[in-house]
Amino acid sequence: HAGERGREVARMLRKLVERHDPKKNGLVTFGSNYMPWENTQKAAEEVEVVGYNYAEYLYDAHHKKYPNWIIYGSETASTVQSRGIYHFPFSQSMLANDDEQCSSLGNCTTSWGAKGTERCITDDRDARFCLGQFIWTGFDYIGEPTPYSTKNSYFGQIDTAGFAKDSFYIYQSAWTDYRKKPMIHILPYWDFNEGQLIDVRVFSNAPKIELFLNGESLGVAEIDHENGKKLSGDWQIPYRKGILKALAYDEKDQV
């Protein structure tokens, strides 16, 4: 669909779908990596729903240009993370260290994917005209190693053993209601070298988070899940032996 015959082929395929699915059990669509290209946009006129792969930055402009299009994120995210692995500092973006593992802090990105899980969530949330998104991926899988040359992918929010990674809880905090099912998640584990500077992140669907170390408050973070760009509480603290605890509060400051 990126070439000059793209629209012609898209029209032919749409007619075949309509012939074999006269009751319209499914909608005609495609998921494209080439939505910036004019020929692809022409081909998109032939389908009923238009899918964008890693192109959330085009949503607003294309919605203005093609207000009748029904659009969605057909493939998004491609953030990478290994469960229980943390590469500090959080402010340093990377793909992997020499251990060929990706950091679960949220600072490992691919060249084509979202610049972070929070960005993936907020771009979709703020495009009110968008149907939603298909995240790449729910589970890790064998193949497509990024970084190369490991056995499996790191894209999943759940690993191949079926355990949720930290990123799983960012989505949970954004997509659930604390008034019905409150949740809070803290990372990383708390066992490092004395004095080592550690990034601590907390995810919750509640509007306020407070972090404690050995009973001492380290501060409060307020989260605006409706309109805010920052969906986590973040602290950077020197490691001290003890108990790290996070509490979530509702709008009346009730735990």
Predicted regions and their residues:
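Extended substrate-binding grooves/exosites of carbohydrate-active enzymes
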Residues: 1-225, 232-253
